[in-house]
Swiss-Prot record:
NCBIfam families named in the record: 16S_RimM
Note on domains (UniProt): The PRC barrel domain binds ribosomal protein uS19.
Record gene name: rimM
Family: Belongs to the RimM family.
Superkingdom assignment: Bacteria
One Pfam match: RimM
Function description: An accessory protein needed during the final step in the assembly of 30S ribosomal subunit, possibly for assembly of the head region. Essential for efficient processing of 16S rRNA. May be needed both before and after RbfA during the maturation of 16S rRNA. It has affinity for free ribosomal 30S subunits but not for 70S ribosomes.
A GO cellular component annotation in the UniProt record: cytoplasm
Protein name: Ribosome maturation factor RimM
Single Gene Ontology MF annotation: ribosome binding
Record note on quaternary structure: Binds ribosomal protein uS19.
PRC barrel domain sequence ranges: 95-167
PANTHER family per the UniProt record, alphabetical: RIBOSOME MATURATION FACTOR RIMM
Length: 170
């Protein structure tokens, strides 16, 4: 799936009385916020850019003061909005690593060329991700391990896997 804009955070509420907002990071790279000069804010189908002023971490959140927002009342109107970036602004990943939104929607084939279905979700388990494949019946859970996932071709929208023995019966 090739999204035009990728969500990297969600504004939860205001922070203080000067118009700052508390953001839940939706990215594995929350440090990116400190290096941003502007960010797109999307709320109820409308998008606009804001200039990033002060940024700091507070517990598991990011506090951002946009230069255009001067008051708590103005910041309150942004509650529930998403912070988004274009694909060209994504943090580059190492080779053989992929963004979840690129994996969802891929067609999955076994090494023999049999179509197993489509990736509909990615479970983040801590040890390794697990791809949820819609087979038309019971979902197939495929561990995202090099021994199992033989290739991913985003251009072709295709993933090739070598299923461990018995995995389809689980």
């Amino acid at each position: 799936m090739h999204e035009s804009y990728i969500r990297i955070g969600k504004i939860l509420k205001t922070q203080g009385n000067r118009g700052a907002v508390r953001v839940l990071p939706l990215t594995d790279y929350p440090e990116r916020f400190k290096n941003m000069s502007r960010v797109q804010v999307s709320l109820k189908g409308f998008r606009t850019f804001f200039t990033v002023g002060e940024v700091y971490h507070h517990k598991n959140f990011i506090i951002i003061k946009f230069k255009e927002i001067e008051s708590m009342a103005a910041a309150e109107k942004l509650k529930g909005a998403f912070l988004e970036v274009g694909r060209d602004e994504l943090v580059p990943l190492p080779e053989d690593r992929f963004y979840i939104f690129d994996i969802i929607g891929l067609k999955v084939y076994d090494t023999g060329g049999r179509n197993l279905g489509r990736v509909t979700d990615v479970l983040q388990t801590g040890a390794n991700d697990v791809y949820v494949v819609d087979t038309g019946g019971k979902p197939l859970l495929i561990p995202a391990l090099k021994q199992v996932v033989k290739s991913v071709n985003l251009t072709e929208g295709k993933m090739v896997v070598e299923l461990p023995e018995g995995l389809e019966e689980l």
